[in-house]
């Protein structure tokens, strides 16, 4: 059965640059995939790489897909192209599914609201709460640590008691700064009058797993790995090295969805699913994986990424988005 593959690269601009310890992110580049079989069934997929997390670039994904031509199904996607593995496998899964369009976007209470880095988080947090989010995520390691810890203390004073806060350092802290942050987090988490800090995400670079394990054992506040576990291979490696803290998983850059689901079902890890700032096409596939891998009660989904771009693509269906490009 012939399956035709069509590709559409895209670029979309953040309304405001996303500030993280990796630096400002202004443009999200990606690649949409459309498959159609001889029966007229269609499947969409998305390649949404994050090269600074270790994935391939859009150019590498495009070169691979174009080089395959009509033979694209006869060659396995190399492990070095995890975002391409996700995109192609998701598109094939949708093509084979009876009807992918029974789609239900999760409610805001099930989604973690994303706050801008810096002091602006103080003004945006109430808006996220008003939108229904009860878990919020704040990027740290962007401004001087004394300023950020000062803003943290203001933020938790302003949040309702049932709020949960995730702090994401994107591997940008030194060991001393990570300890400074964990002291500040434990001070909040031992005060029953304040909101809870759910975890400190990727405090150190991925090559410092031993230090992060020690931090996890030395403080009350949990540590989550993100950049350390970007692919299924890295998930398995950290698991095999004994990591039992939180695993933040971005399905769009993790590689094969089937392999990811197998890892989840085999090990039942403490998982938080996270967006790669993909479009509706990648989002639906990633959230479908999260739904299959997250036993209730699941932690809030790290998919508060809609509305961060300067376009209206988040309001479109996959077919409408494909036609728009
Ligand atoms: O995880 C979330 O809640 C939202 C997604 C998110 O924070 C990220 C997506 C992609 C790259 C990073 O800037 C960032 C992260 O590090 O988790
Ligand atoms: Mg992160």
Locations of regions flagged by a protein language model:
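Catalytic beta/alpha-barrel core
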Residues: 114-116, 136-145, 164-171, 193-208, ...
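Generic structural signal for hydrophobic
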Residues: 127-128, 152-155, 181, 185, ...
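A short, flexible N-terminal coil/short beta segment enriched in small residues
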Residues: 75-91, 195-201, 206, 212-213
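Shared catalytic-loop signature of beta/alpha-barrel
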Residues: 67-71, 208-214, 218-222, 229-325
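N-terminal capping/lid subdomain adjacent to the active-site entrance of alpha/beta enzymes
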Residues: 1-166, 170-172, 176-179, 183-187, ...
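Active-site-adjacent beta->alpha loops and helix N-cap segments on the catalytic face
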Residues: 119, 142-158, 173-177, 204-217, ...
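Short helix-capping segments at alpha-helix termini
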Residues: 158-163, 187-196, 218-221, 294-295
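Long, low-complexity, intrinsically disordered polar/charged segments
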Residues: 104, 108-109, 182-200, 238-248
């Amino acid at each position: 059965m012939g399956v035709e593959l069509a590709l559409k690269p895209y670029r979309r601009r953040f309304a405001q640059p996303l500030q993280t310890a990796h630096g400002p992110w202004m443009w999200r580049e990606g690649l949409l995939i459309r498959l159609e079989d001889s029966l007229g069934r269609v499947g969409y997929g998305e390649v949404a790489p994050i090269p600074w997390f270790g994935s391939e670039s859009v150019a590498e994904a495009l070169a691979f897909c174009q080089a395959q031509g009509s033979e694209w199904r006869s060659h396995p996607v190399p492990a070095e192209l995890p975002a391409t593995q996700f995109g192609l496998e998701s598109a094939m899964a949708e093509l084979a599914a009876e009807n992918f369009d029974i789609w239900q976007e999760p409610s805001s209470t099930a989604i973690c609201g994303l706050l801008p880095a810096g002091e602006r988080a103080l003004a945006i947090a109430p808006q996220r709460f008003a939108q229904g989010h009860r878990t919020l995520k704040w990027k740290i390691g962007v401004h001087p640590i004394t300023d950020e810890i000062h803003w943290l203390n203001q933020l938790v004073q302003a949040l309702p008691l049932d709020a949960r806060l995730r702090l994401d350092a994107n591997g940008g802290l030194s060991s001393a700064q990570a300890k400074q942050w964990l002291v500040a987090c434990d001070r909040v988490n031992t005060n029953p009058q304040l909101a809870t800090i759910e975890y400190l995400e990727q405090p150190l670079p991925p090559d410092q797993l031993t230090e992060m394990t020690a931090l996890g054992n030395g403080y009350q506040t949990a540590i989550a790995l993100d950049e350390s576990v970007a692919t299924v291979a890295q998930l398995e490696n950290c698991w095999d090295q004994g990591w039992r803290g939180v695993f933040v998983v971005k399905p769009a850059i993790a590689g094969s969805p089937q392999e990811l689901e197998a890892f989840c079902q085999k090990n039942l890890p403490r998982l938080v699913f996270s967006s790669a700032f993909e479009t509706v096409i990648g989002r639906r596939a990633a959230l479908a994986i999260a739904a299959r891998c997250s036993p209730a009660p699941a932690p809030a989904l790290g998919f508060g990424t809609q509305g961060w771009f300067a376009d209206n693509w988040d309001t479109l269906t996959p077919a409408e988005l494909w036609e728009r490009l």
